[in-house]
């Protein structure tokens, strides 16, 4: 294998490239990203950077080895697997012996065609746009109450904005389960954030956007409106490639999509033992998958297993919550340490036959390895 092409500029792309070099592979290595920025972490965008305690530049990931050819503003438009080539929007074509698909995902939008001014948070440029608006805003509406929506609401509230969160479902309940979701919702309410349910969904109004409409609440306006309603894997450029796509690029437990082609991060959809494929769009999953994907390219006969990392983390409304295991976690957990009522605890869920299935810490310092062990 003489040349590996990594398409993408995310943590998965950077980790895959770094792993190839760390494993001693010294062939030609190209990282082609559609962004104009060198690879960076998205984790602080909704937290420290939006809060203003860190500069945008601080999100940059560690530099890749100097012999890695990083090409920016390169948007992939087609993959020719037979000829082992990727075509880019500028007309250039890059051949490869091994390919890492790490094109990530983009923010899902709810604006109608031709409607301008919808703000989302996915990239550094998105963060810069929200920060610019927040500097003069007094009120904010966040549409969506998943991890990103709630973290946005937390940071904007901490900045002093009057924040309303609107969601179709109970905040975080579908992701975390009732107990954990209730803990974070209660913290949001204590912080003065209004939580509104809109089972029929939300429509953006104005052009440019200056409000929302939803039932049963009618029309609402705010100085700052941000949509946080999920993401869409960037797979369009693979439509004629013959690769299986189900929400993301379907890969096996070794992150292999096809011979010589691997995928990792938010764009990858791992096939489970039951045959169902699902994405796990979390930072730890991206890192784990990218390392395994790179090793699978180097060592196809003995690829490394890349199960979705059973660990997520969020920080919002004064709650530092780390969670390991199967989510959503049903019912009420057992308290192992601390006291949830006092704001600091370690809790655990067990199945009907007594097996640990999940564990979480709330403002409680515990090593990730130990927390993960409590979920198995």
Question: Where do the PLM segments sit?
Answer:
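FAD-site-proximal beta/loop scaffold in flavoenzymes
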Residues: 116-137, 211-214, 219-287, 292
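A short, polar/charged loop-to-alpha-helix boundary motif
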Residues: 365-376
